[in-house]
Amino acid sequence: TLSAKGKHVIVIGGGDTGSDCVGTSNRQGAASVTQLEIMPKPPEKEDKAMTWPHWPLKLRTSSSHEEGAERDWAVLTKRVVGENGDVTGLECVRIEWDGRSFEEVPGSEFTLKADLILLAMGFTGPKRRGLLDKAGVALCERGNVKADTQRYATDQDGVFACGDMRRGQSLVVWAIREGRQCARAVDEALMGVTDLPR
């Protein structure tokens, strides 16, 4: 079984799953735990006028974090370093965000010691390069594929979108629900009628 006992653990991802990895690593007796997040450090308190009715953007410290971990933001992981098939470190660089994309900060490269790297990365939006660019679908203000919630149709004929691609990062139950509804919409678009459940 996989254990963090006595290891230098790096958790890549700053969300709830990352927090769970931090807590589990501490309880298993990790030598050190470092949590990295690609996004900038959120403010200590949310701007209530700017966030309602959306989930507020603010720094969250869970009980897992209180157990102990180094936390670092605006960090891009570049390369896993290893020796004889074992992980020994993680090469990283600091980044600056302009609101939609980031640039590496020249001269900010650093390497962290690591025996165990846990991937707990979230979703920052659909990748545009490739299929989305070629399809020419419209994007919403958040950078997700714009599609209605009845037929899941985009502005391009015969192209549909649902789940995280359409609504952004969310719970898997939403992706499942929208996937089923979108399948029904596609079936109806192709066949003219559908007997798939909604």
Residue ranges and their predicted role:
Residues 22-79, 193-198:
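Rossmann-like dinucleotide-binding cores of NAD(P)H-dependent redox enzymes
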Residues 11, 92, 119:
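Redox-cofactor binding/interface segments in oxidoreductases and associated redox assembly factors
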Residues 14, 37-41, 164:
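Cofactor-binding loop segments of dinucleotide-utilizing enzymes, especially the Rossmann-like FAD-
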Residues 18-23, 28, 162-196:
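A conserved FAD-binding loop/helix module that cradles the flavin
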Residues 17-21, 41-45, 79-81, 97-99, ...:
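Flexible loop/turn segments at secondary-structure boundaries
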Residues 4-15:
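Beta1/beta-strand and adjacent pyrophosphate-binding region of the FAD-binding site
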Residues 1-6, 98-169:
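FAD-site-proximal beta/loop scaffold in flavoenzymes
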Residues 1, 63-70, 74-115:
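A structured beta-alpha segment of the ubiquitous adenosine-cofactor-binding alpha/beta core
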